[in-house]
Design a protein with these regions (language model features):
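Flexible coil/turn residues that form the inter-helical turn or adjacent wing/linker of helix-turn-helix
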Residues: 17, 32, 217
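A conserved hydrophobic secondary-structure block that centers on an alpha-helix together
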Residues: 27, 31-39
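Basic, low-complexity terminal or inter-domain segments flanking catalytic cores
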Residues: 7, 11, 36-37, 58-456
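Short Lys/Arg-enriched helix C-cap and helix-to-coil transition segments
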Residues: 55
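Eukaryotic nuclear/nucleolar intrinsically disordered, charge-dense low-complexity regions
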Residues: 49-52
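Residues within the DNA-recognition helix of helix-turn-helix
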Residues: 42
Length: 456
């Protein structure tokens, strides 16, 4: 092994702008695990009680009063060396920003520190987030040195990268995506051993690691708000309600921090894309938002626009009349998933499986089985579908016997997903022992030993 090159490159990191509505929702989701709706509820309460400025804004501008208050906080809490060289203003980059209000910040001529507010719980957490971000915007840049070392061994070349913090600057108050700036400072540094060109280091271990690209992650509320803002869809006052509507109508569910589309969402999207493509085109929605902005500014009259939207030659009423005859109700509520021999349909009470099978007497019959709510389109595979349909057609199948009680143990599918049960429901045993299957474990992989462990 030989060191071929060592490079140290100084760089700076500038603080991010104060919060807009969308960036507050994104950061509160990442740091505090709050939904957009919960964030806005907290912010509304803080605003009404005089702790922060108006919380529906797309501007990153700070008033002279806010800049002065921020710089006073920096000097008193961190020292003069942590102040930026001069007052710092930011330019709004959001498309179609209205900038009717300044950025979200603590209110008043001087900022109350989070500990002096008397706030508790989520209100305190959201206020502290706003306070830190505002104060950090007037702090000095962080100065870092990027490190790289090139090594070779025979014909193979390797590169190691690192980072050293020379002056933390605004990192002392705020690090994006981290709850604890001090702890985050340690994570910002990746130090390398002191090496010089020509050195011959001895490796302790060499391990080849494979890498595979992954599909894009599901949207979290934070990343969805960011995408809506990027595409020009929605406004500060509507981001939370857009996401709330998606969830309330059952088009998506929150699994952990991920927005997971439902079977209903697949069916509705397919119908709209086939018969009303303009309505689900992002550019159409962005243009509509622009027109609504012009209406709010008095540049466009609202009544002619609405009449054209609903009753014009290409209006919604005309489109529905022209195309509703082409819509097959049965096909529009059917979802074809790759790899399934059965089909998924959407009914009044949710998604269900449908398949044909030949009975013992040779007659063909149609089997329908409700899909548990916890199963998403991405999770449903042929094995799960077969188990659900088999249980519906033949009744529960025992996976074994409990040696202690002699009762049979069953794997069942209920409204909220697979579960195990000891014994059957009877007059003597109206409530048999049940336990949910662990998340992430496929039903077909569940053994008798697993089931007994869950039931104990």
């Amino acid at each position: 092994w030989r060191v071929d090159a060592v490079e140290e490159k100084p760089t700076v990191r500038k603080p991010v702008p104060p919060f807009t509505t969308s960036t507050l929702q994104q950061e509160a989701n990442r740091k505090l695990r709050l939904s957009a709706r919960e964030t806005m509820r907290c912010a509304q309460g803080l605003y009404e009680r005089g702790f922060i400025t108006y919380m529906r804004t797309d501007s990153v501008h700070l008033s002279d009063q806010a800049i002065s208050a921020s710089r006073s906080c920096v000097e008193s809490l961190y020292g003069k060396e942590y102040l930026s060289k001069g007052p710092r203003q930011f330019n709004t980059k959001a498309r179609n920003a209205q900038e009717a209000h300044e950025a979200i910040r603590p209110s008043g001529e001087s900022f109350r520190t989070p500990g002096d507010t008397g706030l508790e719980g989520r209100d305190l957490a959201v206020y502290e987030l706003i306070w830190k971000r505002t104060v950090a915007s007037q702090m000095a840049e962080a100065r870092l040195t990027m490190l790289s070392v090139d090594l070779s061994s025979g014909k193979a070349s390797f590169r190691a990268g690192g980072k050293r913090i020379d002056f933390p600057g605004f990192f002392r108050a705020y690090v994006e995506g981290s709850d604890d700036p001090d702890a985050a400072l340690e994570g910002q540094e990746v130090l390398l051993p002191a090496l010089a060109v020509g050195d011959a280091p001895k490796p302790k271990e060499v391990e080849p690691l494979g890498h595979q690209t992954q599909p894009p992650a599901r949207f979290s509320e934070a990343s969805l708000v960011k995408m809506l803002e990027k595409e020009g869809i929605g406004r500060p006052s509507t981001y939370a309600s857009i996401i709330g509507t998606i969830v309330d109508r059952g088009y998506a569910t929150l699994l952990g921090n991920a927005l997971t589309p439902s079977f209903t969402a697949f069916a509705v999207t397919a119908l709209l894309e086939e018969h009303f493509p303009d309505l689900v085109d992002t550019s159409f929605t962005a243009r509509m938002e622009n027109t609504l902005d012009e209406i709010s500014h008095g540049k466009v009259q609202y009544l002619p626009y609405l009449e054209g939207f609903y009753k014009g030659d290409e209006g919604l009423e005309t489109q529905v009349q022209q195309r509703e005859g082409d819509i097959d109700p049965g096909a529009s509520r059917t979802i074809d998933l790759e790899g399934l021999s059965s089909v998924v349909r959407i009914g009044r009470f949710g998604a269900y499986l449908e398949a044909k099978r030949v009975s013992d007497d040779g007659e063909e019959e149609l089997i329908k089985a409700t899909l548990p709510q916890e199963i998403t389109p991405a999770d449903l595979d042929e094995d799960q579908a077969e188990l659900i349909l088999k249980q519906k057609a033949d009744g529960p199948e025992a996976i074994g016997e409990d040696p202690e009680t002699g009762d049979l143990v069953y794997l069942l599918f209920g409204q909220y997903g697979p579960y195990v049960q000891r014994g059957q429901v009877s007059d003597e045993n109206p409530k048999p022992k049940r336990a949910s299957r662990p998340k992430g474990q496929k039903p077909e992989d569940l053994t008798l030993e697993d089931a007994l462990g869950l039931l104990r």
